């Protein structure tokens, strides 16, 4: 299966690379050199990378494999959202706005926001990956 960025952009709540860059820049600016925030960010990157691996392999799986792995994927996705929330909560406690978290949206407001949060997690894994060369 060949997937393209253009196809992705046609999906509900798709986030452009430019928007993801902006959100990431806002996030990094608020984290700054705060040791605890950096630790939370590292934990987020670890789970985002794990989730991105699962998600990137998803189109390659047959129906039985998807059924077998679906609960694990959902659990990992839930953990990604929890880690975003933990980082945002901590930053707010430090007097930051964490407006980037609101920009990603909340599942309670629109179920597609869950997918957008997963998309952004994949973006973070992508950025980490290309910087690892």
Which residue stretches match the model-derived regions?
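Short intrinsically disordered terminal tails
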Residues: 1-6, 129-133
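Short, charge/polar-rich alpha-helical segments
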Residues: 3-17, 23-45
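Intrinsically disordered, low-complexity regions enriched in serine, threonine, proline
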Residues: 7-8, 47, 52, 60, ...
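Hydrophobic face of amphipathic alpha-helices
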Residues: 12, 16-19, 24-27, 49-56, ...
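Amphipathic coiled-coil alpha-helices
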Residues: 16, 23, 40, 47-50, ...
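Charged, low-complexity interaction regions
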Residues: 29-39, 56-69, 96-100
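Amphipathic alpha-helical binding modules
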Residues: 74-133
């Amino acid at each position: 299966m060949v997937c393209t960025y253009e196809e992705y952009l046609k999906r509900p709540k798709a986030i452009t690379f430019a928007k993801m860059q902006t959100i990431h820049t806002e996030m990094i600016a608020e984290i700054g050199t705060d040791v605890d925030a950096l630790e939370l960010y590292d934990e987020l990157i670890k789970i985002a990378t794990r989730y991105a691996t699962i998600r990137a392999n998803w189109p390659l799986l047959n129906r039985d494999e998807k059924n077998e792995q679906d609960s694990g994927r959902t659990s990992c996705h839930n953990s990604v959202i929890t880690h975003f929330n933990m980082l945002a909560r901590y930053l707010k406690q430090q007097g930051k706005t964490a407006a980037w978290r609101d920009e990603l949206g909340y599942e309670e407001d629109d179920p597609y926001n869950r997918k957008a949060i997963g998309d952004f997690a994949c973006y973070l894994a992508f950025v980490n990956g290309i910087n690892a060369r």
